[in-house]
A protein has these predicted regions:
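Interfacial aromatic-anchored transmembrane helix boundaries in multi-pass membrane proteins
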Residues: 30-40, 68-105
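Residue-level signature of transmembrane alpha-helical entry/exit and packing/kink sites
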Residues: 11-19, 45-48, 59-60, 90, ...
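Juxtamembrane membrane-interface segments at transmembrane alpha-helix termini
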Residues: 52-54, 58-59, 74-80, 137, ...
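Alpha-helical transmembrane segments in multi-pass membrane proteins
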Residues: 18-26, 48, 52, 66-71, ...
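Structural signal for the C-terminal ends of transmembrane alpha-helices
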Residues: 54-58, 108-115, 175-180
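Membrane-embedded alpha-helical hairpins and interfacial helices in multi-pass inner-membrane proteins
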Residues: 115-183
Length: 183
């Protein structure tokens, strides 16, 4: 019985460390901007999908939830937050829909079956990222008005960057899924 409790404790500690590491990775990916035209690219959506693909939907969603919670309480984890953070005010701003979309995208990416061909993996990752942008546009339209050019503001500038990130993750996906065996 003690062995079972010890193994369960080790598993909980391992999950906890993965979630903390994922949250740190998300924060770093939000803060580092890669020059890209017309809008600088972060690797945030890549990390969101990476967490789901590598560790499954439970750890992926838990990691994103922790990250969002950190931002809501005022830690400067989001892409545009100042050093002192601004919490709920920033969270409910123009990017809230995208941030909520991270949860659903990580969930879908975590449910991927990687025994299929590369085209199918690519398609599922496109679906995952599409959820982020759909929720982002819905919130943005609600916030700034539906009469604004929402696609030009909230989607089009990021399409090439997303295609790059999805392509990279598609190539890595079959290797990353092997990490699930260790958790």
């Amino acid at each position: 019985m003690e062995i079972v409790k010890s193994l369960q404790s080790q598993k909980v500690i391992k999950y906890f460390l993965i979630v903390i590491f994922g949250s740190i990775l998300l924060t770093i990916s939000a803060k580092i901007k890669i020059p890209f035209y017309p809008v600088p690219m972060t690797m945030q959506t890549f990390v969101v999908l990476l967490m789901g693909v590598t560790f499954g939907w439970k750890i992926g969603v838990t990691t994103i939830s922790l990250y969002l919670f950190e931002g809501v309480i005022g830690l400067p984890v989001f892409a545009g937050t100042p050093e002192k953070g601004i919490g709920l005010i920033y969270f409910t701003g123009p990017t809230m829909g995208y941030l909520i979309g991270f949860l659903f995208a990580s969930f879908i990416a975590g449910y991927l079956n990687f025994k299929t061909n590369i085209f199918f993996i690519f398609t599922k990752l496109i679906l995952s990222v599409s959820i982020i942008y759909i929720l982002g546009i819905l919130w943005l339209g609600n916030l700034i008005g539906w009469d604004k050019p929402l696609l030009q503001l909230g989607v089009t500038p990021f399409l090439l960057a997303e295609l790059f990130k999805i392509s990279l993750l598609t190539i890595l996906a079959k290797k990353l899924i092997k990490f699930r065996k260790f958790i």
